[in-house]
Amino acid sequence: MTSNERILQPFTLPNGTELKNRLLMAPMTTCTGYFDGTVTSELVEYYRARAGSIGTIIVECCFIDDYGLAFPGAIGIDNDEKIAGLAKIAEAIKAQGSKAILQIYHGGRMVDPQLIGGRQPVAPSAIAAPREGAAMPRALSGEEVEGMIAKFGDGVRRAILAGFDGVEIHGANTYLIQQFYSPNSNQRDDEWGGSRDNRARFPLAVLDITHKMARQYADDAFIIGYRFSPEEMEVPGIRFDDTMYLLEKLAARGVDYLHFSVGATLRPSIVDTSDPTPLIEKYCAMRSETLAQVPVMGVGGVVNVADAELGLDHGYDLIAVGRACIAYPDWAARIAAGEELELFIDSTQREALHIPEPLWRFSLVEAMIRDMSMGDAKFKPGMFVETVQDDANELVINVSLENDHIADIELAASPVQTVEFTTSFEEIRERILTANTPHVDAISGATSQSEAVKKAVAKAMLKSSKALAAEEGGNDAAPKSYDVVVVGSGGAGLAAAIQAHDEGASVLIVEKMPTIGGNTIKASAGMNAAETRFQRVKGIQDSKELFYQETLKGGHNKNNPQLLRRFVENAPQAIEWLADRGIMLNDITTTGGMSIDRTHRPRDGSAVGGYLISGLVRNITKRGIDVLLDTSVEEILMSGDEVSGVRLVNDEKEVIEVQTKSIVVATGGFSANSAMVVKYRPDLDGFVTTNHKGATGSGIALLERIGAGTVDMGEIQIHPTVEQQTSYLISESIRGGGAILVNQQGNRFFNEMETRDKVSAAIIALPEHYAYIVFDEHVRAKNKAADEYIAKGFVTSASSPRELAEKLGMDYHAFLATLECYNGAVEKQHDEQFGRTTALRAPINEGPFHAIRIAPGVHHTMGGVTINTDGEVLNVDQQPIRGAYAAGEVVGGIHGGNRIGGNAVADIIIFGTLAGHQAAKRARG
């Protein structure tokens, strides 16, 4: 029998159930459930598409208790109402001829409090996971441990009633069952902890109740599997002999298979790194005759027949397949037919492959996505040597190109290279090669280096394309032509480009900076919109009229009423526009000046800017929209009173003319142009700015030269919470999450949720001219941005208010009195001191306690060029300049005398898509 035949032959489990082959789809979290853990139709179709040729599908982990979900969008089996939805998954899989097994789990101390309504996670002991930002769990009482076992039993019963052929007990990945067995997380002194036998009681009890439910509600064919992580890195922690001890006990009680949870089938020890022996070989050598009767399953890195064959040869009986089943729904049929597969996903095929939007954005899936739109791109094959600069070093990059793809990227030897440097280079190299485009996300912690490498690849591609054109007899000096030219690659520019492309226009994006993202990438709070479906799901009652009135009030009634009305009316559609393109802003908070939770942000509560730009860039790449970086627009060319083209200059000092019928200027404001700021606001001389260095007002000057009018140029906003050493903006969502502001004496001094101008003025009026944002662990847990501030060293933390006050040099008694007074206001939902009416969410009483020193900085310029409600640029006589459109901070009039936090992101998407629509409409006739 050949190896291929071995893989595809039926396999009988110890309980007599026959699997049609040895191949299983591994359980992989998709984050595609509804907010309440119920099943979506998209998830049903995802599993239906992957059933059939593969013998068995293990459905992603289901939480058995509403304290147990470890992921946003997780699906649950914690109540009987979930049975109907799960039954749809089971039926979809079984109808195609595959077995359906459901994995059940509880996250324990790995649960983020924000996923369970801000409640404290539970665990065997009150010991936080050894990772940055981990929440402190509450230890389960003895009675609660018994109750938790019963909940696992109820989960098994529901899985049976939903029609599943079996369950897999998730005893791996540091979740609750593993936590009970680990001496790191279980330091109890009762019958559930202490000795290895006591620590094994919980996983064995879960197996026992699973058998009990199977006997009561299922037949003998019901499959019971157990997944385990063979080792832990922590000290103390689970070692391989501990694992073998537990597995022997599980086998003695009866289990139909055991499932290694490792990243690669032949992974060696992560504890004894000097020993290269694969753990599966150790397992086979150490197991008893009883354990040898239990089939063992391997997972990790299986793409082709040879990979599965290697696993069988080393001792696995069954092979679970992960990413390959995502990339190829019919994976088993393909390898049965002898296909050799490459692990990539065509960026245009998400819908065809039935990959849910949340799963599409997972890093492991994103790494497989390849931009197939470059099929039309043609290069002159060869190696191009590019010299670029990151923040600290000059880098020499060798870029090898073939006719239609990027073949390789090499970093020339340099004495400045470190292990960290070369590691991050390899990561960005892999992203670019996999995506076949330089427009990929930078590596976290290595942004400057990543952008330099991306720039080198982009320059090489441009040179190669020009060389090929010259070789084929093309005239490189001849003007290029696009329907729409977008100037600026922040959120407004990218949104305009995507919209114009989707309406049939050919589009060029021109960006003067070396990187995509503009100032949007620094946005933190979120995106305001009223009457959205995400508000309705959360039961938030809101109205567009209230949004309009609060924005008008916040802008001191200086807003252009027509533009503001268009802004408010189009905001919900803008949220949906993003969602339709895979950018989900479905977590909701509030910002200063708003009385309702309407600030939409990413599901995990992280800063909106990077998430938004990453999603928009994926859409740009997917569509094959041309982008020129390090290129400035020197002049907008006119033919009579109409736009006819642009004159560009790149970083090689080449002058390029591009013909176009429509131009969208989305270059941002002028906060980084200190001379321009001081011209209109002399009182702001010396203030730092939160903006990136490209925010110089160049687009305003460009449009003024063709006759554009301007408005509100003296309306410049300072943001109250800026870290002064780095000019880093501290998100308004921290205050919106329940933080307070205190002065150096430890006292509150103003309503933290007032508009930015008023809060800034109050801080400036303090003798010290700075303040502290103070918050506790509850606020930190619900705001992912806070973890970033901690990592950057902005945060002073302490275990108690007294310790925090001492570290900040403030009077402890005054600080404690401040906290007591504020916590009383939260309890009464009434702030007698300063009239705060919003974001009185929870008392500040959960340690550790945190503080960030802040002061105001120049943040937003409300003034800019004049436009009408169609995004057309108006001249000094308020007449449209034909073919000229503008969006984002380059525009004046929308925000009046003060911009509300969360309105800028709404502005760029609303007016960016509007400008893109109108520009394409004009260009296409």
Curated annotation (Swiss-Prot):
Catalytic activity: succinate + NAD(+) = fumarate + NADH + H(+)
Binding site for FAD: A492, E511, N519, T520, A525, G526, V633, H860, E889, A904, V905
Pfam families referenced in this protein's UniProt entry, alphabetically: FAD_binding_2 (PF00890), FMN_bind (PF04205), Oxidored_FMN (PF00724)
Oxidoreductase recorded as keyword: yes
Primary location recorded for the protein, binned into one broad class: cytoplasm
Stated consequence of mutating A446V: 50% decrease in covalent flavinylation
Induction: Induced under anaerobic conditions in the presence of fumarate or malate, but not tartrate. Is repressed under aerobic conditions.
Domain of life, source organism: Bacteria
Modifications made to the protein after synthesis: Is flavinylated on Thr-447 by ApbE2, encoded in a neighboring gene. Flavinylation is essential for catalytic activity.
List of residues binding succinate: A525, H719, S731, E732, H859, R899, G902
Cellular compartments annotated: Cytoplasm
Mutant phenotype after disruption: Cells lacking this gene lack cytoplasmic fumarate reductase activity, while retaining this activity in the membrane fraction.
Residues annotated for fumarate binding in this entry: A525, S731, E732, H859, R899, G902
UniProtKB keywords: Cytoplasm, FAD, Flavoprotein, FMN, Oxidoreductase, Phosphoprotein
One cellular component (GO) term of this entry: membrane
Cofactor binding, note field: Binds 1 FAD per subunit.
Cofactors, names only: FAD; FMN
InterPro entries with a match to the protein in the record: Aldolase_TIM (IPR013785), FAD-dep_OxRdtase_2_FAD-bd (IPR003953), FAD-oxidoreductase_2 (IPR050315), FAD/NAD-bd_sf (IPR036188), Flavocytochrome_c (IPR010960), FMN-bd (IPR007329), OxRdtase_FMN_N (IPR001155), Succ_DH/fumarate_Rdtase_cat_sf (IPR027477)
PANTHER family: FAD-DEPENDENT OXIDOREDUCTASE 2 FAD BINDING DOMAIN-CONTAINING PROTEIN, FUMARATE REDUCTASE
Subunit structure: Monomer.
Domain comment in the entry: Consists of three domains. The first domain of FRD (Oxidored_FMN, PF00724) carries a non-covalently bound FMN and is used for NADH oxidation. The second, FMN_bind domain (PF04205) contains a covalently bound FMN, that acts as an electron carrier between the two other domains of FRD. The C-terminal FAD_binding_2 domain contains a non-covalently bound FAD and forms a site for fumarate reduction.
The protein's name: NADH:fumarate oxidoreductase
Organism: Klebsiella pneumoniae (strain 342)
